[in-house]
Amino acid sequence: MAEGAQGAAFTAELRKQVVTGLGHMFGDAESSVWIDFSDHSNVGDSAIWLGQVQVMQELGIEIAAVVPTAACTLAVIGSTLRRFPDATVGIQGGGNFGGLYSNHHQARLAGLQASANRTVVQAPQSVHFVSDAAKDELRQACRAPGRLATAVRDEFSLKRMRDLDPAAILLPDIAHCIAPLTAPPPVKAVQILRRTDREAPPAQATGLQGNRDWLRDDRLQRLAWSARSATYRVPAGRSVFSHVPPAVYTRIAQRRVSRGVAYLAKGQTIVTDRLHAMILGLHIGRRVIAVDNAIGKLRAYHHTWLEPLGAPVTFAGSWDDALRLARSDT
């Protein structure tokens, strides 16, 4: 089977599992308020958001309001929920459950506290506790009155999460639910995208010079984000963002994903240590050579979902090995 057709086949299977699982988690909900929208240049977070939008549309659940991470205070979330008393609360999926990123950690704590006596759905996450204190904070927050439905996206995260939520379930990453992507044909054999943040693995390979991460918007997006960021820093201004139409956040995410896909599509083979570069690369029919990140996120996900379905992903033990493997195939 060609890589493009193979990708379409396993993507359809993973998408089906996500939609079915989240359908059970949201139950008979008719509307939702989503918190912890990541207004950040990371393309992976935007792909997750677009996947969430697609699932809500398929389930017939309105997205009534969105609260970005930087606006996720107890006061802002509380006032937003009072505007939508019947809405189910969704917390954005991703790879930040456990305190690895303090802004997302605090947003999740505030969201769980503000949502007492509501149904709260945590979309699929990777779980990595950075400290006992972070784990204890989340344990207490998960005990808030109401119904908490938690999904995690790999078997290792499920084991970690069961201590906090014994009913947690396993679902694929929600980015698999993104609408079909259009990618130009490759213009070179290999395209490299590597992390430059705290999750980056050791990168001794000399061939990495000049290759980049995708943590940078284009100029127009950077200017727009700077304006939003200035408002985020003003307590009185944060509530403004919960009144922004959800479609605005979706357009922001679409621009970021388009930028990421255009970068990845240049190569016939993609070499990366980013989970969503791996996922998006598969979506556009590319072969992927993966290097695990610093906390084992990629291998855990591959072991749980992609390997059993025969996805065209090859793992390398280091960046040096990955580059040698990529060059040997060209």
Residue ranges of predicted features:
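Active-site anion-handling motifs in enzyme catalytic cores
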Residues: 1-330
